[in-house]
Amino acid sequence: MGVALFDSNILIDYLNGIKAAEKELTRYSHKAISIITWMEIIAGTYEPELATVKEWLLEFNIKTIDSKIAERAATIRREKRIRLPDAIIWATAQVGSMLLVSRNTKDFPATEVGVRVPYQL
C-alpha cells in the first residue's frame, strides 16, 4: 500500500484504546501525519503521558506545510468551506499523493477520491 496520512481523530481513538483505530494503524507500513495533527495531539496530552506520546508520534512521517500545501489548502478552504486546519490536513494528503484516513465524514466525505473512512463510533 501507499502512504496513509492519518487525521487526528484516528490517533486520538488509538490513544483512547479504540481497537478499530489500532487495527487501522497496523494496515499501513508507511504512515504520516500533518504537523497540524501533531500539534492537536500534543495540545491534548498532559503529563505524565506527554513524553511517551511524543515518542510514539515519531513513528509517523511528520509533514510540514510548504507553499504547495498552503496554496492547495487555501483552495480547499474556499471551495469546501471547511476549517483551515482540516483544509491543511487534506491538502497535505493531496499534494503528497497520500491516502487520507479519517472518520471525520463531515469534512472528508468517504465518497471523495483519496479519502478512507475505516470505521464510525
PLM regions: where:
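Asp-based phosphoryl-transfer active-site loop
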Residues: 4-13
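PIN-domain endoribonuclease scaffold, especially VapC-family toxins
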Residues: 2-4, 20-84, 88-99, 109-114, ...
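Conserved acidic donor-binding loop of glycosyltransferase catalytic domains
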Residues: 103
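Flexible glycine-rich beta->alpha loop in the catalytic core of nucleotide-sugar glycosyltransferases
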Residues: 106
